[in-house]
Every structure is written in structure tokens, then in C-alpha cells.
């Protein structure tokens, strides 16, 4: 028993390392063996917890770039402990969730699949995989989630990720859990020397068919002729963004970006999250429409928003407020005396409406402001309500390139889910165009200032995921429950007959 537990802990740790690499860099080659090790280790929930802890610590290690935090009022001696505590908290939260999932799986297995055949075991795997997939979707609507197993296929395996066109990120997570289960069961069959060749061949055939089906779903034929849209990447260091010098330079820099976009014959210019201060007024009338991140006041409450300045105007006339705020960074109320306002310069913001639909004089858009990109269901709802394209604005400074890679992976996933082009514009990057097929085109190099031009297509069709959302995944879970129930009844009847 002790050796078995030790082996499970090793499997959990190694699997967590592979999963962390897979989430950080994308690709089934990392995640599939990681999930196979999770299935093997989850007979001990503590080992499964270790898997989640290590996976998140590795994939979210960019959180340590929060240090130094002295610029938001954190005393210098506390800067490293605070940043490390946030990082460790995220790992601990993942450990609890994965541990609970493993405990639930072992409990269900004990009740329903003890001494059961392959059908019951497959039903159990379907149930646990679909529970994981639905859990990721639910967590994506909460403030404590960034990227999970569902987003780990990209950018490495766009063909298999094409299945998100029908099943979304939750479906991709479920599929990868099932691939991991297949690898684990095949490895067990190989150790016994019975049936492993058949298991391997059947699994590889299914995997090949899934890739082919996913690739076929990426085809898009309803795109309009492209429109040139400009993106401004100001590359302003966040830690000095609110200094007097930067605030003096910003209005003229923005005006210059508008002029450059106009010279490029762009239809409009997009600027990143948090650029404009409340009640901002342009130095001169805008030569073309401006969509820029910024702040605004509403009934004494400050909100982060995407602001729209029409051609010929100097102030915003339309907006959409940020709904999903960053924990500690944005929605932590100011403490007495203003000593600590949260881990950003704009602590104490209030959330806006949940809808991500922006209606303005241009083509209707589904908008994600930074952290909101992880919530695919909200963007799919906006597309169902009429959005023709997706817009993601962000400020990922001071975080390193690792976070930018994850941001683009999520952008690709959102484009595939909704069959819409996505324009990403961020302070230091990534500034890129992601086509409805999930293919990305970098507009500007990371951490450099510039104005890039994107040929944006608009789409009218509705994807399967936009139409059905999580209904297929819920149906799969119910199918698995029925399968387990029938296996239990069959086992009970056999026991009665033997008596």
C-alpha cells in the first residue's frame, strides 16, 4: 500500500510537470501523457491534488512577475512574499479542485463500476471527463480561472482544436481527458500482455478521425471582403503609466497614432485596455473612429471600459464596461487610509453588465477586455446576439512573453468556437489578427511601439457551439450516468441470479 501511494505521488508530480508545460506551450504531445498519469494517480486524491498544484505553478509562473509591487503601495519587504503567495494560492486552488474531482471519481467507481466490465469503465471515464469539461466552463465565468486543459491544444494542434467549433473549450477538455484515459488503459493492457494492440489501433483510428473532423469544421465560406483596421501598441510600462511624464506624453502619442492609422487608410483604430483616463478629451477631432480601452465614472463608481470616439469627435459617445474584474487587482476596495488599493493602479473598480455585445456605428462586435477572454460562453452569447467579429483589448505588462502566448492561444480558441475573426490589441502585445479558422497573424512585435494593420473579415453564420453551447456536453454526461446505472442494474440482476 505504501509503495502504491508513493508511485501515485510520483505519477502526480511528473504528470503535473507535463501538464504545466502543455498549458504553457500548447500541444497534445505534452497533455496526453500528463492526463494518462493523472488517471493512474487519481486512485489517491492526494496524488491528483499534487498533479493540479504542480501544473498550475508551472503554467502560471508568470504571476511572479508582479514583483516588485512597491509602485502600488506594497512595502518593499512584502513584495516578493505577496507575489509568491498569489502564485501559491492559485496552485493550491487547483490542487483542491483536482483532488475533489479525483475523490468524486473514486467514489463513483466504488459505487458503480466495482467488478464491472469495459462498458461500465468507459461510462465512468465519459462521466468524469465531461464533469471536468463542464467544470472548466463554469470556472471560466468566475474570477478565479485563466486557462485550463481545454485551451492547451493551441497553438500546437489546430486540427483537433477545430472540434471546439461544435463543442467549445469544455468539449476539448473532455476529449483530452478521454485521450489520457485511453493511453492509461492501453498501458495497463500492455503490462498484462492482453489486448493492448487492439486498444492502441482503435484509439489511434479514433484520434485520426477526430483530427479530420476537426479540420473540416474549420472551413469558413461566409466571410465578407476584408476591411483594414489599425491597431496601436503603445508599449507603455505599466509601472510608470500613471506618472506625470507619461500622462503628458499620452495625448500627443494617441493623436499621432490616429494620424498614422488615417495615413494607412484604416477604417478605424483600436487602442489597448486602460489607455484613456476618465472624461478624456482628444487634442484634435478624431480623423477616424477610435475604439480604446479606458476608464469612466458612473454614479460615483469607476469602471474599466472600451470607449468609442466617433470620427470628427473628441470624446467617447459609446462604451462597453468590463464585467469580469481581476481579483485583488481591480475589485478589491480601497483599505482605510488608502494604503493598499489592490495589485494595480486602479484598485476598487466596479463591474459592468455581463453582455459582451458592443453596438456602435461600425460592425457589431463581441468584446473581451483582458481577463474576459477566458470566458468563451459570454463571447458566444454576444455572437448569438449579432456580433460579426471579436475584439480583445488588454494590458499584459509587466508579465513576460509566456502570458502573451497563453493569451493568443485563448484568442485562437475563441475564434474557432464562434467562427469569427478576432483582433487582439494589447499594450505590450500580443497585437495580432486571429482568423475564424484559428490561424493567427502577428501585427507587431511584442514590447515595441507601433501601429499595425489587419485585414478583418466579418461573418454572419452561427457555429454549432454558439447555437448549442454546453448542451452536447451535458448530454454526454447524462448518457454516461445512464450507462453507469444500467451497469449497476445488470450487476445487481446477475448477483440475484447467482443467489
From Swiss-Prot:
Q: Does the keyword Cytoplasm apply?
A: no
Q: So where's the catalytic machinery, residue-wise?
A: 273, 322, 370
Q: Which UniProt keywords apply?
A: Acyltransferase, Cell inner membrane, Cell membrane, Membrane, Transferase, Transmembrane, Transmembrane helix
Localisation: Cell inner membrane
The entry's function note states: Catalyzes the phospholipid dependent N-acylation of the N-terminal cysteine of apolipoprotein, the last step in lipoprotein maturation.
Which family is annotated?
Belongs to the CN hydrolase family. Apolipoprotein N-acyltransferase subfamily.
Indicate what this protein is called per its UniProt record. Apolipoprotein N-acyltransferase
Q: Which organism is it from?
A: Prochlorococcus marinus (strain MIT 9313)
Gene symbol here is lnt
Amino acid at each position: 500500500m505504501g509503495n502504491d501511494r508513493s508511485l501515485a505521488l510520483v505519477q502526480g508530480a511528473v504528470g503535473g510537470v507535463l501538464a504545466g508545460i502543455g498549458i504553457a506551450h500548447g500541444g497534445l504531445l505534452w497533455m496526453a501523457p500528463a492526463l494518462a498519469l493523472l488517471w493512474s494517480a487519481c486512485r489517491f486524491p492526494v496524488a491528483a491534488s499534487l498533479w493540479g498544484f504542480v501544473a498550475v505553478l508551472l503554467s502560471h509562473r508568470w504571476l511572479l512577475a508582479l514583483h516588485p509591487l512597491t509602485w502600488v503601495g506594497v512595502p518593499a519587504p512584502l513584495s516578493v512574499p505577496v507575489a509568491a503567495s498569489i502564485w501559491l494560492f492559485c496552485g493550491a486552488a487547483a490542487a483542491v479542485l483536482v483532488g475533489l474531482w479525483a475523490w468524486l471519481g473514486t467514489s463513483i467507481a466504488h459505487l458503480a463500476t466495482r467488478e464491472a466490465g469495459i462498458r461500465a469503465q468507459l461510462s465512468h471515464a465519459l462521466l468524469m471527463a465531461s464533469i471536468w469539461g463542464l467544470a472548466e466552463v463554469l470556472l471560466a465565468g468566475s474570477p478565479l480561472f485563466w486557462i485550463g486543459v481545454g485551451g492547451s491544444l493551441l497553438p500546437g494542434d489546430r486540427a483537433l482544436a477545430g472540434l471546439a467549433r461544435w463543442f467549445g473549450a469544455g468539449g476539448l477538455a473532455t476529449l483530452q481527458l478521454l485521450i489520457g484515459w485511453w493511453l492509461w488503459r492501453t498501458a495497463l493492457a500492455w503490462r498484462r500482455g492482453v489486448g493492448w494492440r487492439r486498444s492502441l489501433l482503435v484509439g489511434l483510428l479514433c484520434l485520426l478521425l477526430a483530427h479530420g473532423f476537426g479540420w473540416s469544421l474549420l472551413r469558413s465560406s461566409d466571410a465578407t471582403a476584408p476591411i483594414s483596421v489599425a491597431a496601436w501598441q503603445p508599449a507603455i510600462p505599466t509601472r510608470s503609466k500613471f506618472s506625470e511624464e507619461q500622462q503628458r506624453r499620452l495625448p500627443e502619442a494617441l493623436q499621432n497614432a490616429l494620424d498614422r492609422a488615417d495615413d494607412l487608410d484604416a477604417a478605424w483604430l483600436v487602442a489597448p485596455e486602460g489607455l484613456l483616463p476618465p472624461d478624456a478629451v482628444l487634442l484634435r477631432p478624431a480623423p477616424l473612429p477610435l475604439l480604446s480601452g479606458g476608464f469612466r465614472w458612473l454614479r460615483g463608481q469607476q469602471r474599466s471600459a472600451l470607449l468609442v470616439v466617433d470620427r470628427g469627435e473628441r470624446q467617447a459617445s459609446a462604451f462597453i464596461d468590463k464585467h469580469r474584474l481581476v481579483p485583488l487587482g481591480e475589485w478589491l476596495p480601497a483599505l482605510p487610509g488608502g494604503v493598499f488599493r489592490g495589485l494595480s493602479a486602479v484598485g476598487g473598480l466596479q463591474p459592468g453588465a455581463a453582455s459582451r455585445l458592443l453596438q456602435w456605428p461600425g460592425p457589431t462586435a463581441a468584446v473581451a477586455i483582458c481577463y474576459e477572454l477566458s470566458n468563451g460562453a459570454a463571447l458566444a452569447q454576444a455572437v448569438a446576439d449579432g456580433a460579426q467579429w471579436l475584439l480583445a483589448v488588454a494590458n499584459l505588462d509587466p508579465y513576460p512573453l509566456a502570458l502573451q502566448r497563453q493569451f493568443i492561444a485563448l484568442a485562437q480558441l475563441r475564434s474557432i468556437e464562434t467562427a469569427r475573426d478576432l483582433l487582439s490589441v494589447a499594450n505590450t502585445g500580443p497585437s495580432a489578427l486571429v482568423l475564424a479558422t484559428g490561424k493567427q497573424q502577428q501585427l507587431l512585435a511584442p514590447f515595441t511601439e507601433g501601429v499595425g494593420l489587419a485585414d478583418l473579415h466579418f461573418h454572419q453564420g452561427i457555429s454549432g457551439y454558439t447555437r448549442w453551447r454546453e448542451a452536447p456536453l451535458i448530454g454526454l454526461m447524462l448518457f454516461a450516468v445512464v450507462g453507469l446505472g444500467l451497469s449497476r442494474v445488470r450487476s445487481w440482476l446477475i448477483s440475484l441470479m447467482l443467489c
